[in-house]
């Protein structure tokens, strides 16, 4: 399994570790062509290694894909884990205002952090493909990147509404907002054009935060 530290090396741009170079090249190839279509020789070429090195470090293409998915999920869990801990305390205390504030901070911080990571658009493609056509690795992606954050937000929304929002309704609302985090984090051409933005920096994220705050205030009264 690819360790979380290896994904951090990819994010930081550290090319000293051949495993990180292989994984970075693999992320791009899996995003573009899927597991079945990915070209192991192309991954070796892009990473400046060879097929033997990929087999040595990951056991082949299947092992490399498993490592990328596991590393992606572990990296995500490490980023958002502190929010989950804080949310559990807030929900236990039934603090409506704090729950609303944390929901906004969680969503905006996620966009702020992930929109600056160059490999996120490729990771989003891998996530979307797994969601649309699940492989044996789907559960790992689903648990970390779909189920946990949506359930977390749903609990915050229920708490923020003073318990008036039912779980099913909260999940629908949470999923709608969480989907937008992935969309904005990928900084797709469609999103930039829709808003008339040339890029998405701090100014644009601040506008999103203001809009989101208004939506949550009106919805979670």
Please report, for each region that a protein language model flagged, where it lies by residue.
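Hydrophobic alpha-helical connector segments
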Residues: 82-120, 170-177
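Helix-turn-helix
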Residues: 21, 29, 33-71, 75
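Amphipathic, non-transmembrane alpha-helical scaffold segments
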Residues: 69, 73, 139-150, 205, ...
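Short hydrophobic clusters on alpha-helical segments that form packing/core surfaces
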Residues: 22, 26-30, 177, 216
